[in-house]
Amino acid sequence: MDILPHEKQIHEYIKTIEHLKKQSQDNPIFDVEIQKLEQKLDSLKQHVYSELTPWQRIMICRHPSRPHAVDFIRHLSESFVELAGDRSYREDHAIVGGLAKIGGIKCVVIGQEKGFDTESRVYRNFGMLNPEGFRKALRLMQMAEKFQLPIISLLDTPGAYPGLEAEERGQGWAIARNLREMMRINTPIIITIIGEGCSGGALGMGIGDVIGMLEHAYYSVISPEGCASILWKDASKNVEAASALKLNAEDLLNLKIIDSIIKEPLGGAHHDPHITYQNVKQFLVEQLHILRRIPSQILLEQRYLKFRQMGEFLEG
């Protein structure tokens, strides 16, 4: 497992404990020392993970072993039938979507997938959507509306693909169209930010009735590196930018950008993915039961007001 900078001391404790346990298999002389070290390790973990900086949490969010959209879909749904294509240009492999059943409830699930190794990351375009990806997502959402199925959108992208070809095919227009259409799609929409939620790539699939966010995910108009490059002309100022952007879950909840924080295991989702899947599934099933009871007209009005009120402030 990749060790993050703030976890090095924790890893040293773990290595020492493992070494002593091997030594104590034939001689229990180390048992008391092992017990003391394990207690110190627990205290150290609580201390380190309770005082994470915004940048450290971004490193957790970007950890190579963090569960991706395909993992969540596989573990959350009792059944899943993938659907492909935008019916216009081509398939975008950065989007995985289809018909699913979660907690016994039929729905449409759409996730942004970055890939887990070099080959799959290239295949998935590192989770950066092209215009056809946004069109594919919208096609699935309109199908969900037609059959009155709730929609679950899993966000995990460093941003929409900024290539020339994507711009020529109408990248900005595709995102803008999704913003407009998602605001008036007449079926419940639950947004869940499972990793990186960056820029228009996330926003183009991020309009919904409820927005949940994993504890160490982030949601921002730009990456810290991009912000630092623009404001300070120095990408190495990413730590300062991460703090200034207010992109972590607690800040976004206080600013009323998101509605709920979904707990992760101590140290991040990659330390115990199954606990993370359980927590996300519990959140989704609870919200599905709540939203399905709200009349459609009220649901649309509340969705519109939710986003209109973001960023409002009163002058003293």
Swiss-Prot record:
The species this protein was found in: Protochlamydia amoebophila (strain UWE25)
EC number from the UniProt entry: 2.1.3.15
Chemical reaction(s) catalysed: N(6)-carboxybiotinyl-L-lysyl-[protein] + acetyl-CoA = N(6)-biotinyl-L-lysyl-[protein] + malonyl-CoA
Disulfide bonds: none
Localisation: Cytoplasm
One Gene Ontology molecular-function label: acetyl-CoA carboxylase activity
Principal cellular location given in the protein's record: cytoplasm
Protein's recorded name: Acetyl-coenzyme A carboxylase carboxyl transferase subunit alpha
UniProt KW Lipid metabolism keyword: yes
Root EC class: transferase
Function: Component of the acetyl coenzyme A carboxylase (ACC) complex. First, biotin carboxylase catalyzes the carboxylation of biotin on its carrier protein (BCCP) and then the CO(2) group is transferred by the carboxyltransferase to acetyl-CoA to form malonyl-CoA.
Keywords tagged on the record: ATP-binding, Cytoplasm, Fatty acid biosynthesis, Fatty acid metabolism, Lipid biosynthesis, Lipid metabolism, Nucleotide-binding, Transferase
InterPro entries membership: Acetyl_CoA_COase_a_su, ClpP/crotonase-like_dom_sf, COA_CT_C
